[in-house]
Amino acid sequence: MSVKFEISFAKTVRLNGGLAILLKDADSESPAGAAGADPANVFAKAARIARFTAKGLSSLDIVAPEGSPVDRIIVIGTGRAKELNAHDWLKLGGAAAARIRNVEKAAIFIDLPGVQAGGKAAADFALGMLLRAYSFDTYKTKKGDDDDKNGAQKPVKVTIVTPDVAAAKKLFAASEAIADGVILARDLVNEPPNVLGPVEFAAKAKALEKLGVEVEILTEREMRRLGMGALLGVAQGSVRPPRLVIMQWKGGKAKEKPVAFIGKGVVFDTGGISIKPAAGMEDMKGDMGGAAAVTGLMHTLAARGAKVNAIGVIGLVENMPDGNAQRPGDIVTSMSGQTIEIINTDAEGRLVLCDALWYTNDRFKPQFMINLATLTGAILVALGNLQAGLFSNDDQLANQLTAAGLVTNERLWRMPLGKDYDKMIDSKFADMKNTGGRYAGSITAAQFLKRFVQETPWAHLDIAGTAMGSTLDEINQSWGSGFGVRLLDELVRENYES
């Protein structure tokens, strides 16, 4: 079971048993807080024996001797502390969280000698702890060692010692909102597909109303009235009805244009008639990672009271093979009026997105549109699971996204767009076809979407490699990563809040 933390901040802490976690700069002799937590200086001998050099994220676990103010001391190396950035502080928090087990309380000393760890560092450290503590264990029936008889997790009381308590508390309120948004996105991706269909997903988004988000849910009938033939074509093979969810957060000025985020929400993707291989198909419960990220982002923006008008639109469908399913060779008419020849029913995400993009642009006239989608396997071939693909018709927006990715370490790599690629999706029988063939697959998918954004600044993030099954690290031990929530929150915070 996952560990839960009750985190507080203090300038000093009275030590009386429990765990002390001390950060150690590779360039200093003693760890932070050593004078109070380790008066006997047992660290010096332990470090010498273990050849501990305080390399970044390395650790030394010490049982405190009789008479010590704490029961146990864990020293975590920071490397050269003067070089730490915001993401490094997140990772240190995650490393600390991973080592807190079987204790009721922990004091964490982060104010390194010669490197003042102010409120921002403390809040980032705490955010890293919250992100690392997450695990998806809803369907596990066996209790962990730290659980009570009812299976409830006993929270560990954590005090982070920092010289700037007021700033840490203020910034941590926003950090908690970010953590909650990421965790919501992770939960949605991790849920089994028999539990989370389009209707159930829409209900999860509807719950954001308690935070002040306005939520509308369009049914199949309403989408048909709007002419969303591309989205509805994907859904027609499933007994589960599709939904289009519109979330509005009005935190900016009354007449200020909103920023808009659109997510692909294929709650399960068999591939349809162009069916996928059986091996690994269970992972297609995560094919709604884009919609999950948008929902998590809207939670974060509302929970922290972001001073921006933001729109989140998610298209929710299930792609199933059935006697009524869409066929290769079908031609559908999108909301834009453009016709699409279906070449491969497994290239369905772009069909969902094209109607959602057109609807968003037509109704809200946003400053920009950013869509997120687990869209192509081709982006995995190109970038692996370390970076998401970025496609954009606007250099300023692309640069802002790239910069936000560097801050949050949710990194993006810009991919090309161009007329020669666009020609690859021309059709003999319709305005376009839904796949351009084997080569340049992630690019032709982006070119397809570009046909539905008109002149609005737009970016497409292909997160197929980063939303699920990505490399585990200090702040994520989950299959569903929640990729995109922190990235887009940073984008909004730095560039678009009034």
Curated annotation (Swiss-Prot):
Transmembrane segments: none annotated. GO terms for biological process: proteolysis. Mn(2+) 2 binds at K264, D269, D287, E348. It is found in: Cytoplasm. InterPro entries: Leucine_aapep/pepB (IPR011356), Macro_dom-like (IPR043472), Peptidase_M17_C (IPR000819), Peptidase_M17_leu_NH2_pept (IPR023042), Peptidase_M17_N (IPR008283). GO terms for molecular function: manganese ion binding; metalloaminopeptidase activity. Keywords: Aminopeptidase, Cytoplasm, Hydrolase, Manganese, Metal-binding, Protease. Its cofactor is Mn(2+). The active site is at K276, R350. Its EC number is 3.4.11.1, 3.4.11.10. It holds the Pfam family Peptidase_M17_N. CDD domains: Peptidase_M17. The keyword Metal-binding applies. Binds 2 manganese ions per subunit. It catalyses: Release of an N-terminal amino acid, Xaa-|-Yaa-, in which Xaa is preferably Leu, but may be other amino acids including Pro although not Arg or Lys, and Yaa may be Pro. Amino acid amides and methyl esters are also readily hydrolyzed, but rates on arylamides are exceedingly low; Release of an N-terminal amino acid, preferentially leucine, but not glutamic or aspartic acids. Mn(2+) 1 binds at D269, D346, E348. Presumably involved in the processing and regular turnover of intracellular proteins. Catalyzes the removal of unsubstituted N-terminal amino acids from various peptides. Belongs to the peptidase M17 family. NCBIfam families: PRK00913.1-2 (NF002073), PRK00913.1-4 (NF002074), PRK00913.2-2 (NF002075), PRK00913.2-4 (NF002077), PRK00913.3-5 (NF002083). This is Probable cytosol aminopeptidase. It comes from Rhizobium rhizogenes (strain K84 / ATCC BAA-868).
